[in-house]
């Protein structure tokens, strides 16, 4: 491993890309520490310690939301905008045709930026009122209050756009996927909170609950097993054999070779979890924004509290949405009829199935089986940490979404680095 890094460091272009990526990540973490003007960050600490949806969003922003800093919104506006644009691409024919054009992806990326700015503005306004309701603002009335509101909201929006720009710079000049690496950095920065959870278990064990001495190593083993499980399932794929008929082009014989069609078990990645989280967290987030008083409005308080991410109703709805959106995203990404037609045009076929409808039907059946297994995998990884946290009373920061993102980004970045080195005849991680 260390030899591989030394070999990578000897390649000037790769060295520059690694340094550039590291520099962007350092700047991102510095931005997470720059406070927004006119806000008292200490007044917000208690609100984010209650385990509600804002606490979850704070984890995804690397703690910047609780400290009310420049990058408080994190990459959430960009992710939500990307989801909206993807759904509109399926629903609106003009956008669907645009996605198929040569330069269509660049135009869609520009639409993503504008949509991300709108989402960031909406979230900034909502978070401003949360800060105001918590009494964390230095100026709330008069011209000073208006000026403070404009500055705070503009700072949040500018920070969100700057994060989007930083992610795109990593895509162009660095290694790996920029936005994914920024999320990775945010999640990893919160791992220090695991130390607090561990010391809490040891304290309870020393106070007369010796079962926690057994629980701690069990949790460590389960975490390691979960990481291995996610790595294996993320890389798992079903390979369908493809045979190409021989044909003569000029004086050369073409084809006659066997290949395969790879169908990954987790084809949709973490997107179903992110989208399901966005939908099921809306009531809880609104409740956090409104700061409803339990004594004055007990019914509304109970309703919004029901959608707290540690409640059992949240777990059930979350699980069902993950299953549904996993099928939805696979249906968007894969068209069995189009795959079958492409195979026919290239003189390819699946052994035992005639070209055309029989081939597309077989691919459809295979996709349905794989999608079911992948959906169960995603649901288990996302929901089990929440259930475990409810049963043990621990605040498990490394949830299913975090685990999938961390493992997925690590694997993708490793592949990118290995591919870069393989092109220069260097032995990489996977070789």
Regions found by a protein language model. Name each.
Residues 1-99, 103-431:
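N-terminal cationic and glycine-rich segments that engage phosphates or anionic surfaces
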């Amino acid at each position: 491993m260390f030899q591989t890094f030394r070999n990578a460091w000897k390649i000037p272009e790769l060295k520059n890309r690694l340094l550039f990526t590291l520099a962007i990540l350092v700047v991102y973490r510095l931005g997470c520490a720059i406070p927004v003007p006119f806000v008292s960050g200490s007044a917000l600490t208690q609100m984010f310690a209650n385990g509600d949806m804002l606490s979850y969003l704070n984890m995804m922003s690397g703690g910047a939301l609780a400290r009310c800093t420049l990058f408080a919104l994190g990459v959430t506006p960009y992710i939500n905008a990307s989801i909206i644009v993807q759904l509109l691409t399926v629903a609106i024919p003009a956008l669907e045709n645009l996605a198929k054009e040569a330069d269509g992806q660049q135009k869609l990326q520009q639409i993503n930026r504008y949509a991300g700015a709108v989402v960031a503005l909406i979230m900034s306004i909502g978070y401003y009122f949360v800060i105001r309701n918590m009494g964390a603002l230095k100026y709330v009335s008069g011209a000073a209050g208006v000026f403070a509101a404009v500055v705070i909201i503009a700072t949040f929006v500018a920070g969100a756009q700057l994060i989007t720009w930083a992610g795109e710079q990593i895509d162009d000049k660095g290694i790996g996927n920029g936005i994914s690496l920024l999320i990775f950095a945010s999640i990893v920065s919160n791992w220090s909170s695991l130390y607090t959870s561990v010391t809490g278990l040891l304290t309870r064990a020393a106070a007369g609950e010796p079962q926690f001495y057994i629980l701690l190593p069990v949790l460590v083993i389960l975490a390691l097993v979960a990481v291995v499980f996610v790595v294996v399932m993320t890389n798992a794929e079903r390979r369908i054999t493809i045979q190409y008929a021989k044909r003569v082009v000029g004086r050369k014989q073409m084809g006659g070779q066997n290949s395969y069609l790879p169908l990954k078990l987790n084809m949709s990645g973490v997107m179903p979890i992110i989208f399901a989280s966005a939908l099921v967290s809306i009531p809880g987030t609104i409740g956090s924004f409104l700061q409803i008083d339990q004594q004055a409005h007990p019914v509304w308080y109970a309703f919004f509290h029901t959608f707290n991410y540690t409640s059992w109703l949240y777990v059930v709805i979350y699980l069902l949405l993950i299953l549904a959106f996993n099928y939805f995203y696979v249906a968007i990404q894969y068209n069995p009829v189009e795959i079958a037609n492409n195979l026919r045009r290239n003189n390819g076929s699946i052994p035992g199935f005639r070209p055309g409808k029989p081939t597309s039907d077989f691919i459809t059946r295979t996709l349905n089986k794989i999608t079911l297994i992948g959906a169960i995998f995603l649901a288990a990884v996302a929901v089990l940490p929440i259930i475990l946290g409810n049963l043990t009373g621990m605040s498990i920061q490394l949830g299913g979404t975090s685990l999938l993102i961390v493992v997925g980004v690590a694997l993708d970045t490793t592949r990118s680095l290995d591919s870069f080195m393989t092109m220069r005849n260097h032995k990489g991680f996977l070789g």
